[in-house]
Amino acid sequence: MLGASGTIGQATLRALLHEGHEVICFMRKETSPAHAQIRHDLQDCTFRYGSVLDEDSISQEGFQGEHFDVVVSCMASRTGSPKDAWDIDFKAHSKVLALVKTMGVKQFILLSAICVQKPLLEFQYAKLAFEKLLIESGLIYSIVRPTAFFKSLSGQIERVKKGKAFLVFGNGVLTSCKPISDANLGTFIANCIQDESRHHKILPIGGPGPAITPMQQGQYLFTLLNKPPKFKHVPVGLLDVIILTLSALGKLIPSLRDKCELAKIGRYYATESMLVLNTKTQVYDPLLTPEFGQDSLFDFYKKMIFNREAIDLKYHAVFK
């Protein structure tokens, strides 16, 4: 397994172990408390360390000449910046795929993203480039494209608790999604091993409906916290100005190019729904978006607020 250190990776690893699979995780060697906690919590798994960008490391430190039936990858670039995306989402995966094809591995399960159905960003093109290689590889493949994650929609909880406004782009209903929990997604990914109906398929997947807009997310938080609703509407045009400015400055200052791409990513998520895109109408359609699991975003909000569950939002905590 690749990418076991992230929250989706951990959930998938737990699901694999729960189903009785013997799992070897190949990951970067880190000494952070988070990684130590993962190793402590998941002692039924074997951890091996090395670099996913080094073919020799993947072979000698990862596979070690052993036979494997399936590769499961929840690996993804951390920031979405162009270099990171092509290094991890494409190059690292490509190196692993080339190796496993020579080792008798029969099946490859890939965690991708639903947003690649309408590619406008470098990380989306990188993901699609590897998806194409995987589809053409001859292996049994399952490409899982989830909608939104719970923690991606939880970055404003502390802001609202402090009495600040909930930020929305435009009118707050430009987008909607059917978010899926880590645990439900992990189970869905793990089930792809045995479920032949998911073999040789691209699998968009969301959590239970109905689809939720940013305004509905904010309204629920205010109700939950017993606070009067207070929204601040951010014009999408502001993001356009930021992108144009960073794009122009990036020609002179290379370090700003990644920031420009990150601004483009922000605009994409502010204006594009994380639902299946109807290819005939070019409209995002919640009815076409498959659902899996029972966990709801609003129940997750309750746990975070009333049970004081600590979740590392990392890059998701954009609005503070």
What are the functions of these language-model segments?
Residues 77-163:
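Glycine-/Pro-rich loop/turn segments that contact NAD(P) or position catalytic residues
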Residues 152-159, 192-203, 226-229:
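Glycine/proline-rich active-site loop of Rossmann-fold NAD(P)-dependent oxidoreductases
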Residues 176-183, 205-223, 233-244:
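Substrate-binding strand-loop-helix patch
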Residues 1-21:
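N-terminal Rossmann NAD(P)H-binding glycine-rich loop of SDR-like oxidoreductase domains
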Residues 26-31, 51-52:
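N-terminal Rossmann-fold cofactor-binding loop
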Residues 237-320:
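A hydrophobic C-terminal alpha-helical subdomain
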